[in-house]
C-alpha cells in the first residue's frame, strides 16, 4: 500500500465522516450499548496489538498498533511496506521511511480523534445513527455532525469480553477502508518515543 493510498484511506476519510443534522434518539437498549462502548474506551488509557488494514482497492496491509490517550497512536506497517503513521497528540504524521517523506495533518481532522480523545464522547459533535447487534458483539455507526460531506464510521466491539475489534470508514464515494484489530491488550509504560513525529517537522496540512 502506497503513502498516498494510506493517507487518503486512514486519515483523510475524516472530512467524509461529516454530516450536518440533529442527533437521533436511540432506543434504550441501543443507548445502553453505546454507553458500554464509551465506558470501555474511557477505561482504556493505553493499548497495543496488531492490525490488518484493507483499503478501498482491496489491498491488505498488516502491522503493530500502539495507542495512548489522549491523542497518541502509532501504526507500524510490516515489511515490505515502509509506511509509519504516528499521532503525537496534536498532529498525525504519515511517513514513508524508505522515501524519507512525511505528510502531517491535525488529529482533529482524522477519524482517530473518536477514540483517542481525553474524554470519549459519542453525544457531542457526533451523531450515532445506528446500533447493530451481532452474535458476539455490536456495531456503532456514527457521523460527524460538523460538516456537509456524507460518510460514516462503524466501530465494532465484542462484548464477552468487551473489546474494540476495529472500524470501517465509508467515504462520500462509498469507498470503504477497514481496520481490524487483533489481540488488542492494555499496555503500561509505553515508550514515549513511540509517539514522536518521524523526520523533521514540516508545515501541517489543513
Range-by-range predicted roles:
Residues 6-11:
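N-terminal export leaders
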Residues 20-22:
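N-terminal signal peptide c-region/cleavage motif recognized by signal peptidases
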Residues 26-33:
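Cleaved targeting-peptide boundary
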Residues 39-56:
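A short, Trp-centered hydrophobic/proline-enriched beta-strand micro-motif
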Residues 55-57, 98-100, 173:
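Solvent-exposed strand-loop boundary residues in beta-sheet-rich modules
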Residues 62-114, 177, 183:
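An acidic-aromatic
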Residues 99-146:
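Flexible, surface-exposed loop/linker segments and immediately adjacent secondary-structure boundaries
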Residues 123-125, 133-206:
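Gly/Pro-enriched, hydrophobic low-complexity segments
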Amino acid at each position: 500500500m502506497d503513502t498516498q493510498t494510506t493517507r487518503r484511506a486512514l486519515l483523510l476519510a475524516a472530512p467524509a465522516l461529516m454530516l450536518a443534522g440533529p442527533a437521533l434518539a436511540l432506543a434504550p437498549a441501543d443507548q445502553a450499548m453505546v454507553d458500554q462502548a464509551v465506558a470501555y474506551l474511557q477505561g482504556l488509557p493505553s493499548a497495543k496489538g496488531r492490525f490488518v488494514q484493507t483499503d478501498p482497492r482491496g489491498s491488505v496491509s498488516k502491522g503493530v498498533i500502539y495507542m495512548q490517550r489522549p491523542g497518541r497512536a502509532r501504526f507500524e506497517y510490516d515489511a515490505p511496506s515502509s509506511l509509519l503513521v504516528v499521532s503525537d497528540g496534536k498532529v498525525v504524521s504519515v511517513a514513508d521511511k524508505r522515501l524519507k517523506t512525511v505528510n502531517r495533518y491535525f488529529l482533529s481532522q482524522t477519524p482517530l480523534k473518536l477514540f483517542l480523545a481525553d474524554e470519549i464522547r459519542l453525544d457531542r459533535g457526533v451523531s450515532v445513527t445506528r446500533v447493530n447487534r451481532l452474535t458476539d458483539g455490536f456495531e456503532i455507526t456514527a457521523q460527524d455532525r460538523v460538516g456537509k460531506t456524507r460518510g460514516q464510521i462503524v466501530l465494532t466491539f465484542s462484548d464477552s469480553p468487551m473489546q474494540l475489534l476495529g472500524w470501517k470508514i465509508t467515504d462520500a464515494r462509498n469507498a470503504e477502508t477497514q481496520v481490524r484489530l487483533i489481540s488488542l491488550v492494555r499496555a503500561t509504560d509505553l515508550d514515549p518515543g513511540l509517539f514522536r513525529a518521524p523526520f523533521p517537522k514540516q508545515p501541517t496540512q489543513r
